[in-house]
Design a protein with these regions (language model features):
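Core catalytic region of metal-dependent phosphoesterases/phosphodiesterases
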Residues: 253-338
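Conserved beta-sheet core of the metallophosphoesterase superfamily
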Residues: 379-455
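Interhelical loop and helix-boundary elements at the membrane-water interface
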Residues: 1-65, 69-73, 83-118, 128-132, ...
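Acidic, His/Gly-rich catalytic cores of divalent-metal-dependent hydrolytic chemistry
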Residues: 142-191, 201-222, 430-431, 435-461
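Binuclear metal-dependent hydrolase catalytic cores centered on His/Asp/Glu-rich metal-binding motifs
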Residues: 323-324, 339-376, 382-383, 444-448
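Beta-strand-turn-beta hairpins that frame and shape the catalytic cleft
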Residues: 220, 229-242, 334-347, 367, ...
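N-terminal active-site segment of His-dependent metallophosphoesterases
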Residues: 196-286
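Active-site neighborhood of phospho(di)ester-bond hydrolases with catalytic His/Asp-centered motifs
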Residues: 242-245, 270-276, 303-311, 329-331, ...
Length: 461
């Protein structure tokens, strides 16, 4: 039992710095070497060795000592020695010009595993064999963890990877979109797998509300709206946009013919899909793409079809969508011209789950006085968009709550933005916005006091 405690203690101490890096990214991550270089001109330790990591590991060691029944001084000193070993490894790697953050078996694990036994061996009266076995097991476990963190979470999955490489983002991508993780989906996405698909759905069935709720969900329609925009170029007066989002189409396939019935009657200038193809936020996405292709065939748009990704979507969907003729805007913009005048569509990545929306990057190549239509899956970056000078903000995600209560409104909006912009028109400064209730449903296939919609929006100068 003692050997298991020691092994867990060492693993947890060394797991603390990358765990904090996972959740905090670059916050409080001041380099231990202050960016200084050794006399060979190479970094002393490198940017990945931080005061945050050192202090947190030593603090964790002290707390773990109390938890495991070790003397406090043992926890403190063993953790400090382990971090000292880690710094020795980093210093050695820098001298041989080994890049920071890359895996180097044995060198990465040995010193941080062995140095703590300066105090652990005499205090616990461990034999040479016991200490050697513990060091070996520590190195093996630490190496496996390092491979997962550095070679999977911190390795770009493809040459065209468009997002800033962060461990938290990669973990979300892998756990939501990789088939290799399919057996772990219910554990990682517990809220959706159990709460929505089991508990909430069961509630609606027991109360007898499920049938009527599903009927409401299938009762979608088209809403025709006008918006007056003083800065709209004259050539684009009466521009018509078809905007639809939140299909979640593999969860309610009966919607496909109704969507097609509506869309085949429309001849918009621009068609925009606002994200969320898949019903679940994890698992297979081939079905929703196949169903989506049947919908896209019905769309006739003068200036093309554009899309942004939602929190239920995967980067792997982009090539398939582009093969359908859709231009996916991922922190990017596109210029639309007519008779010498132009407008810009500015689309950002998902701001809700993946938290990868970058308004500054998306609008970086646009003239400051240009007319800009901002496309985002959710209303959550409304303040950044207004500060960037957007004229019109189009989004979805909230489903207008999907389930509303009389005189109260949405039970949940699943958005960090104010409830006042959860559906319909809204305004911030000179920017006008519209939040769609979406077409499909999420979680449970019901709606109450809300209706799925396809928006036909006409822009008036």
């Amino acid at each position: 039992m003692l050997m298991i405690k020691i092994l867990l203690f060492l693993w947890l101490v060394n797991f603390t710095p990358p765990l904090l890096a996972f959740f905090l990214d670059d916050k409080l991550a001041r380099p231990l070497d202050f960016g200084k270089r050794f006399k060979d001109g190479k970094p002393l330790l490198g940017p990945n060795k931080t005061w945050r990591g050192l202090i947190s590991a030593v603090a964790a060691g002290s707390l773990l000592a109390l938890l495991f029944g070790f003397p406090l001084w043992i926890g403190f000193s063993a953790a400090l020695l382990s971090m000292t070993g880690d710094l020795i490894s980093s210093f050695t790697k820098r001298r041989f010009a080994k890049p920071s953050g890359k895996n180097f078996p044995v060198l990465d694990q040995f010193f941080e595993g062995a140095l703590p036994f300066i105090v652990l061996t005499p205090h616990f009266q461990l034999g040479l064999l016991e200490s050697t076995v513990l060091i070996f097991l520590f190195c093996l476990g630490a190496y496996i963890g390092s491979v997962f963190y550095k070679s999977i979470l911190m390795e770009e999955p493809s040459p065209w990877y468009p997002r800033k490489l962060k461990a938290k983002t990669r973990f979300k991508e892998i756990s939501s979109c990789s088939p290799d993780f399919r057996y772990f989906y219910p554990l990682i996405h517990f809220e959706e797998a159990v709460y929505y698909h089991r508990i909430i759905k069961c509630f609606f069935r027991i109360t007898g509300l499920y049938k009527s709720g599903k009927k409401n969900a299938l009762n979608i329609g088209i809403v025709h709206k006008l918006v007056t925009l003083p800065r709209l170029p004259e050539e684009f007066n009466n521009l018509n946009i078809i905007y639809f989002s939140d299909l979640h189409i593999d969860g309610l396939e009966e919607l496909v013919p109704e969507i097609n019935r509506i869309l085949k009657k429309e001849t918009p200038d621009i068609c925009i899909f606002g994200g969320d193809l898949r019903m679940s936020s994890y698992g297979d996405y081939s079905t929703c793409l196949n169903l989506f292709s049947k919908i896209i065939l019905k769309i006739k748009s003068r200036y093309g079809i554009y899309a942004v990704l939602g929190n239920h979507d995967c980067l792997e969907m982009i090539p398939v969508m582009e093969n359908m003729g859709i231009r996916v805007l991922l922190n990017d913009s596109v210029k639309i011209e007519k008779n010498g005048q132009s407008i810009y569509l500015v689309g950002v990545d998902d701001p809700h789950y993946y938290n990868c929306a970058n308004v500054e990057m998306a609008s970086s190549d646009i003239p400051g006085d240009a007319f800009k239509i901002f496309l985002c899956h959710s209303p959550e970056v409304y303040q950044e968009a207004e500060q960037a000078g957007m004229d019109l903000y189009l989004c979805g995600h909230t489903h207008a709550g999907q389930v509303q209560l009389p005189k109260i409104g949405p039970v949940f909006t699943h958005s960090r933005s104010p409830r006042s912009i959860a559906h319909g028109f809204w305004k911030l400064g000179d920017m006008q916005g519209y939040t769609s209730s979406g077409v499909g449903v999420s979680g449970v296939t019901v709606r109450f006091l809300t209706r799925g919609e396809i928006l036909s929006l006409t822009l008036i100068k």
